[in-house]
Swiss-Prot record:
Gene3D superfamilies: 3.30.70.330. This is RNA-binding protein 43. Residues 15-104 form the RRM domain. GO terms for molecular function: RNA binding. Keywords: RNA-binding.
């Protein structure tokens, strides 16, 4: 099965573009690959000869298109708006696609929902969103909701940068709050209850965004699938934490996971947490390039079929020890190498009496 590794092995990253936003629920994987190739071979779309289309990939709705010429890839990216059109019996479907450069450190498109209300009245939220758009222009922001929530979409690295920017801002506000509270207590002791309530509310809202560990340790953000595989299938994660006496505080939030690392042994080396952070980043990057995810949809299926799929996954789990199986109410994710996930999926489909698409 095709994977992002094909791009690296073909030595063609400069001729490759990442295409996100494919309508995965409307067409089969095979048809989508054909539609994508046809779209990017059309000169009206600044396209040209396509060497290969890598789809499906580990990330839902994302394909890699390798052109025969570097110039064509550059032209495709220069034309920022791409519309994938498909005529059906009743209507013509048009879908907006997002294209970007491929790089060794590429993390495909992810979505995240932010709750900016934790900043309270410290900043005007509209101004904050404008600043974020200017700072990270590659991200797409939805309109800000009255409750302070906003959704963002973009590459994993861009979302990671956004999260770190917000955490840094929150830490700064927290420090200002502390300084303000200290000064206020010196001159305003006539209404201590009001003063205490005001400072506590402000501090509490910001603290919900900034984990205690992050203020005194090391923080990193990972792709959730990569993190789960690293934690449950790579013994080096837990053994390294134990070896360097590091406490790991993990928060899974959709497609991204935040990890805060802190030394828990008195007298241990001060750089231990930083060293462990670097090791985890190294491992996660290698895994991101190696891993692939397949998904079995349970939602909408009859209970009998759901049970058959679950039983098949359980039956094959002892044969594929390097495949991680994550069971959810609506679906089952299997994560592993490209060959393992393909063979695992093929085995499940055979056990439940279906053909591999």
């Amino acid at each position: 099965m095709a994977s992002v590794l094909n791009v690296k092995e073909s030595k063609a990253p400069e001729r490759t573009v990442v295409v996100a936003g494919l309508p995965v629920d409307l067409f089969s994987d095979q048809l989508l690959a054909v539609l994508v190739k046809s779209h990017f071979q059309d000169i009206k779309n600044e396209g040209g000869d396509v060497e290969d289309v890598i789809y499906p990939t580990r990330t839902k709705g994302v394909a890699y298109v390798i052109f025969k010429e570097k110039k064509v890839a550059e032209n495709v990216i220069r034309q920022k708006k791409h519309w994938l059109a498909r005529k059906t019996r009743h209507a013509e479907l048009t879908v907006s696609l997002r294209v970007s450069h491929f790089g060794d450190k590429i993390f495909s498109s992810v979505n995240a929902i932010l709750d900016l209300s934790v900043f309270g009245k410290e900043v005007t939220l509209e101004t904050l969103v404008k600043d974020l758009k200017k700072k990270i222009p590659s991200l797409s922001f939805s309109p800000l909701k009255p409750n302070g929530r906003i959704s963002v979409e973009g590459s994993f690295l861009a979302v990671k940068r956004l999260r770190e920017s917000l955490l840094a801002r929150a830490c700064s506000l927290l420090e200002k709050d502390r300084n303000f509270t200290s000064e206020e207590r010196k001159w305003n002791r006539q209404n201590p209850q009001r003063n205490l309530q005001r400072s506590n509310n402000s501090l509490a809202s910001v603290r919900t965004l900034v984990p205690e560990t992050a203020r005194s340790g090391e923080m990193l953000v990972l792709d959730t699938d990569v993190f789960l595989y690293l934690k449950h299938k790579c013994g080096s994660y837990e053994s390294t934490l134990k070896k360097f006496h590091i406490l790991s505080q993990e928060k899974v939030d959709g497609e991204i996971t935040t990890i805060c690392l802190k030394s828990i042994q008195v007298g241990s080396q001060p750089n231990n947490a930083k060293h462990v952070k670097e090791l985890i980043e190294e491992w996660s990057h290698a895994l991101y390039l190696k891993l692939r995810k397949e998904t079995f949809i349970l939602e909408g299926k009859e209970n009998r079929e759901k049970r058959m799929i679950k039983r098949a996954c359980e039956q094959l789990s002892s044969r594929y020890l390097e495949v991680l199986i994550n069971l959810y109410r609506t679906h089952i994710d299997i994560i592993g190498s490209s060959s393992d996930t393909y063979l695992f999926k093929k085995g499940v489909m055979k056990l439940i009496g279906q053909k591999v698409s």
